[in-house]
């Protein structure tokens, strides 16, 4: 026994109690045998790591481990704090806290969106103080036991402790190796365990397992290679477009364009009970029941709406700060481009590569920010800003100069977390009406109350849609106005263990309603549409002289091509090149990765997010190949050599 033995044991017990309880909650009270082993082993592995590091440093300085007790204490305090943060992140995203999530959570405005208050920070400070006190007490107790009780313990007991500790180390490594194998072979249920245990560390040993388990044939490896530089080819195409823009014309230059874009509006709210106006318009105008955003978060989704580009081209556009081709065209044609928003345009640097200099006027209704202590919480009246925005737009639309065509982009906030609406629109009851946090331990049990709150905000948003479309109709401008109604991305309410968005490619997060009024055109034959198809359809309708395929990688909904009846979605990224994508057709969804010059297939599911099952006569390998072939072709859209 050393001076720190009891110190490590006490903190192992403390971490075990917290991690096992948290894992039980995240698993909805149902833990498999292997998950219990993982949950119990996690705190042991953390303690072993801290002890090994502290002992290694002490040996480096030729000193006793006890001399570095404050280093061990600091590491333990950090471990407790990180484990607590990781538990909250798991409750929201079902993934462990990492660099990507750090970028998402600390993007400008996100903490305000989450409703973080000064009292929440004060509570966090109290918890950290409590952790420090506990670690200090455990250190004090360990030192006291060593000073006063060590002589009362037999040498045999001390040896038994050492033997037991070594056995636990071996068992810990066996568990880690087993999970590494299960993780590599993509055992879905076992991977679900990983997403329910805070601070669980995976030993990533793909290079060890790959030679024994998965040996791809040469033809498969060759097919996966990307032999062209699609990003450079895209940039060259943009340069060519800039040279040709001066000679570009359009058949229709007097048609107005109105975008009604709603934060976090998921596809299944387009029903008469929740959004009667939108449901009615979907039967009268072009619509799609399988419409996908470019991504599951705002920046990437908005990129698709205004650029007409599929997700492969977000990163090069973002890095080069390219103005959307469609906005350049409209600007060239003399359009007055106005943006009305209740969201800051600087979010995800959208003011640099989406809402660029082509925009003539920006009407911001974002005066609700009052710092962390501001009551921008669940019972706030942020919906009033959407009302003010609509009134301003209608005033401008009715008084605009008829000879100057306009594009108006209205961006609504009411349907964003925390979901805002007047009390008179509280149709769906009961709904949550207290201050709540998205990472609360008990919120999963109240997900139906949160969802009702969301449906009320969608019901209110539908009222605004009716107000705008009715006003345009009454003004006599309907047959001269393109109207597009959609969400920037979807929103999850614990259907797959998560809340909100940004971290899953399931339909609830990546699919949105889509309704578009193109005067004289009632329908499209496409079964699957995406944000990237909107601008190509508008430019096709206007009769732009440059062919669509030279301008966009999305498709025009006016020109049916069976080979293009699909949508591509990317993972949420704020500043980095995305690696994970999804392609969806009318029946299937395939996740795939694009990295290091290779495109490789991942999980295949039905279009309804159901796992595939063995059905006689269904060739899943062929389905995967066909979907991957379509994705690869779109990847080479601007590459002449491909």
For each feature predicted by the language model, list its residue ranges.
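Transmembrane and membrane-interface helices of multi-pass
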Residues: 1-205
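A short beta-strand-to-alpha-helix junction
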Residues: 317-324, 448-460, 504-510, 521-537, ...
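Active-site-proximal alpha/beta segments of enzymes that process anionic O-linked groups
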Residues: 170-437, 554-557
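A long, amphipathic alpha-helix that forms part
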Residues: 390-398, 432-481
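Short, solvent-exposed loop/turn segments at secondary-structure junctions
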Residues: 15, 262-267, 296, 310-312, ...
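Membrane-interface soluble catalytic domains
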Residues: 5-9, 66-67, 139, 143-148, ...
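Histidine-centered active-site microenvironments of extracellular/periplasmic hydrolases
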Residues: 473-520
């Amino acid at each position: 026994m050393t001076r720190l033995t009891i110190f490590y044991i006490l903190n192992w017990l403390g971490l075990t109690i917290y991690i096992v309880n948290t894992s039980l909650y995240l698993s909805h009270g149902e833990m498999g045998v292997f998950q219990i082993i993982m949950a119990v082993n996690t705190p042991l592995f953390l303690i072993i790591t801290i002890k090994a590091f502290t002992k290694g440093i002490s040996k480096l300085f030729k000193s006793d481990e006890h001399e570095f007790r404050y280093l061990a204490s600091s590491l333990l305090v950090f471990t407790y704090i990180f484990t607590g943060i990781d538990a909250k992140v798991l409750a929201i995203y079902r993934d462990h806290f990492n660099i990507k999530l750090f970028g998402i959570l600390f993007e400008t405005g996100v903490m305000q969106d989450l409703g973080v208050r000064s009292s929440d920070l004060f509570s966090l400070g109290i918890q950290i103080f409590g952790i420090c006190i506990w670690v200090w007490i455990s250190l004090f107790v360990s030192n006291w036991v060593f000073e006063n009780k060590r002589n009362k313990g037999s040498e045999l007991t001390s040896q038994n402790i050492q033997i037991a500790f070594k056995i636990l180390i071996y068992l810990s490594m066996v568990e880690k190796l087993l999970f590494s194998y299960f993780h590599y072979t993509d055992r879905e249920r076992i991977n679900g365990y990983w997403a329910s245990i805070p601070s669980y560390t995976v030993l990533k040993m793909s290079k060890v397992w790959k030679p024994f388990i998965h040996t791809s044939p040469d033809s498969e490896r060759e097919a996966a290679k990307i032999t062209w530089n699609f990003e450079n080819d895209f940039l060259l195409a943009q340069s060519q477009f800039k040279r040709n823009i001066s000679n570009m014309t359009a058949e229709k230059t007097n048609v107005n364009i109105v975008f009604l874009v709603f934060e976090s509006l998921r596809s299944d709210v387009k029903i008469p009970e929740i959004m009667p106006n939108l449901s009615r318009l979907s039967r009268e105008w072009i619509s799609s029941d399988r419409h996908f955003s470019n991504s599951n978060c705002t920046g990437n989704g908005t990129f698709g709406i205004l650029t007409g580009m599929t997700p492969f081209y977000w990163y090069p556009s973002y890095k080069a700060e390219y103005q959307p081709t469609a906005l350049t065209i409209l600007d060239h044609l003399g359009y007055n481009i106005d943006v009305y928003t209740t969201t800051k345009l600087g979010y995800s640097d959208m003011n640099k590569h989406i809402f660029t200099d082509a925009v003539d006027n920006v009407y911001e209704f974002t005066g609700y920010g009052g710092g962390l202590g501001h009551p921008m919480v669940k019972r706030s009246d942020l919906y009033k800003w959407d009302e003010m925005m609509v009134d301003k737009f209608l005033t401008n639309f009715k008084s605009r100069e008829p000879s100057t065509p306009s594009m108006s982009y209205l961006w609504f906030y009411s349907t964003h977390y925390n979901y805002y609406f007047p009390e008179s629109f509280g149709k769906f009851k009961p709904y949550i009406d207290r201050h709540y946090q998205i990472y609360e331990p008990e919120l999963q049990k109240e997900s139906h109350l949160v969802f009702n709150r969301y449906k009320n905000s969608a019901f209110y948003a539908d009222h605004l849609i009716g107000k705008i479309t009715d006003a345009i109709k009454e003004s006599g401008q309907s047959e001269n106005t393109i109207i597009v109604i959609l969400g920037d991305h979807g929103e999850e309410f614990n259907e797959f263990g998560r809340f909100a968005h940004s971290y899953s490619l399931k339909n609830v997060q990546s699919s949105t309603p889509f309704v578009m009024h193109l005067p004289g055109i009632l329908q499209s034959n496409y079964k699957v549409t995406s944000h990237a198809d909107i601008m190509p359809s508008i430019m096709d309708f206007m009769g732009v002289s440059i062919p669509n395929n030279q301008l966009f990688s999305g498709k025009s909904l006016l020109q049916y091509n069976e080979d293009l009846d699909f949508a591509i979605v990317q993972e949420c990224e704020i500043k980095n090149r995305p690696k994970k994508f999804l392609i969806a057709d009318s029946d299937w969804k395939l996740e795939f990765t694009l990295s290091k010059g290779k495109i490789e297939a991942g999980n295949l599911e039905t279009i309804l997010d159901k796992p595939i099952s063995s059905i006689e006569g269904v060739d899943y390998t062929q389905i995967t190949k066909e979907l991957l072939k379509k994705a690869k072709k779109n990847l080479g859209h601007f590459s002449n050599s491909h």
